């Protein structure tokens, strides 16, 4: 982390739903939380994008006037890119080793996303 931050930068770590210390179990049958997202016409990854946006809104309210950059590795970086595209308060994104397309098994699962765009398209939308 020290290679992308500067002295005095505030760094916050977000564990969106189903990740980290609040991770839900992966028993058979599939987890009820994951199944309830599907019943609502969403995916868990869609909820994670909204978690990132909500955290960004909170940080803007707490630290008025700061530049907010989000990032992540692999699929989490792609979720950060989608959050940056949807939230004007996010100024930049740092991605580490993102999947090249939503056709990859490791890519975030977002319903019908390939009808509209793919990962390079979203990165192009948020590029300066």
Model-derived segments and spans:
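Cap/lid segment of the alpha/beta-hydrolase catalytic domain
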Residues: 1-62, 102-108
